[in-house]
Structures are given as C-alpha cells and as structure tokens.
Amino acid sequence: MQKEAVRDAANLPSIRSLVRAVGFEGRSLHSINDLTNDQIYALFELARALEPFHRSSVDLLRGSVMVTLFFQPSTRTRMSFETAMHRLGGAVVTEANPLVSSSAAKEESLADTMRTISKYANVIVLRHPDDVAAREGASYSESPVINGGWGDWEHPTQALLDLYTLWRTHGGVEGAKVVVATPDMVHARTGHSMAYGLARLGAEVTLASRSDYRAPEEVIEGLRRVEGAKVREVFDLDQDGFNDLVSEMDLVYLPGCSAPKGEAAEEFKKMMDEYYVRLETLEKVRESEGRIIRVTHTLPRRPGEMDLRIDDTPHQQYFEAIAYSVAIRMALVAAIVGA
C-alpha cells in the first residue's frame, strides 16, 4: 500500500494534466457525437495512463459522488462504472431496480427523479429503455448525465470501450476494416454508436444486416455527414456471403440482438444462422495469410450468435475488452467531474 501511495503521488500531476486536456469538465455524454475526435483521443491517452490503477486506486475524485440509475438490467456497464468511480477515490450510490425500490414505483416522473438525484450527485449514469424519455429526463438534471444505454438509440460508453480496445490492440483505428454485423441493426444501440465512432476516426466500416432491419435513417444520415467517411451497407447475406465478408475484415463487431419470443423465435434463429461467426472462417485466413481477424461482442451473448470455440483463440477480443473497461470509464468520469 505504501508503494502504491508513492506511485499515486508521483503520477497525479501528469494524470491531472491529461484530465484537463480532454476539455470535457461539467459536460454530459448523451451521444458519442458529443465528443470531438480530439477529445476521444485525449480520453484514450488518459485511459492508458490510468490502466495501472484499474485494480488499485488513484486519488483523483475524493469527495465526489456518482449515482448509477438503471431502469434496465446491466452487469458490465453498471459494475465497470461503479468500479471506475471507486478506483478514482469517489463514492457510488446505486439504484439498479428503480421501478421497484425508488419513487419511480410511485409513478414519479423521470424529470423529477433527475431533478432530485442531481442535488446529490456530481455525475449520474442513466440507463433507460426509452431514449426519448431518457433525453428529456436528462435535460432536467443539474449534474452531468452519462448515457449508459438509452432505448434503441445509442450506448456511447460501450462504443468508447470498443474503440479504445481497437486502438490499443490494432495500433490505431484509422484504416482498420470493421464489420458491424447483426440481422437487426434497428435496435443495435451499441452498433449505432460504434459506427459513428469508427467512421469519424477513419476506419472502413461495413454495416451488415437484414434489409428489413437496416440501421435507422437518423444513423445513416449522421454517417453521411461525417467528412471522408468510408461506410457501406450490405444486406441479406447468406452464410457463404457472410463468411467471405468476415474474411476481408480486421475486426468483426457483434452488437448483439434481442431474441423475440413465441412464433417469431424460429425466424429469429434462421436470421442468426446467417450471421453466425465460425472459427473455421477465421482460421482459414490465419493459415493462408498469417492474419488474425479479431472478434468482439458487446455482451451478453446468446446461444447461436457465434462459435464459442473462438473464446480460447487469439481471435477473441470480447473478454480482452472487459479488462480495458474500467480504465476508459475512469478516464471519462474524471474528465467530466474534473480532477
């Protein structure tokens, strides 16, 4: 502990300088597009400096309080945010089931909830199933609000994590060939945020989905406005076509897909079969070209989305990304709260 304290004291001035360099103090993060490219890269540099502390602590935010307010289930997002705040020396108040245990159970409006919580918190992380309600509710907060996943719209901090992981493992984002693949791009909020981030940072982006579940027009229009963006859409691939597409990539990005129930379940299974990532496809490229195609998934994953044998190979990046999740969220929280 004494050695860690000495290390903290030695690193604090340089880390605080990196925090200030982001230039995001007091700001909310609703969309990945709330950050400039320079701010994204500044967050990456800050996260890299904070990586040594992801299992210890650095005393940047002592006395600050984060409230995590999650109207939908979460494991990784909520826990990594809460861990990040603890590692920064701050405190966390969590409400993981507000419809049961908070005043939301008494039909309190989200606006009033946010008004109230913002009196306590230096920063709020909000997850909500309705993005319109979340955006409106967040506007009533006096404290910065971080989107922890809002409806089908965006999940910017998951995209930040996956962009950071690509930056760390691939040596950069610019020029990387990435496919965002899911039969249902309509409801892929992480895919929307990731597509924006990839396009803005210079990756070559392919959106692969069913034509009747393509990305919302708002997302497509947003991508068209990105100067110099290299983005294409492909639809209705069969398994052979999908395998060929995967073979061209540096990264296969799986934003997940919500499985329907009842009669639609069988049709869903057929859809998933067409976007199933097979180890044989990856290994064929590795053997013929000496190139490793990485696969990442936002998790949780469901049976039938991918070949589980990938877990124990160099192609796997989804569990590797979790190791970076605390550092990038430490960086974001520190930049917003200020240190």
UniProtKB/Swiss-Prot annotation:
SUPFAM superfamilies attached to this UniProt entry: Aspartate/ornithine carbamoyltransferase (SSF53671)
Family, similarity comment: Belongs to the aspartate/ornithine carbamoyltransferase superfamily.
Temperature dependence: Thermophile. Is much more active at 60 degrees Celsius than at 30 degrees Celsius.
Assigned EC number: 2.1.3.16
Enzyme class: transferase
Subunit structure: Homodimer.
GO terms assigned for molecular function: amino acid binding; aspartate carbamoyltransferase activity
Protein name: Ureidoglycine carbamoyltransferase
Top-level lineage group: Bacteria
Keywords linked to the UniProt accession: Purine metabolism, Transferase
Pfam families in the cross-refs: OTCace, OTCace_N
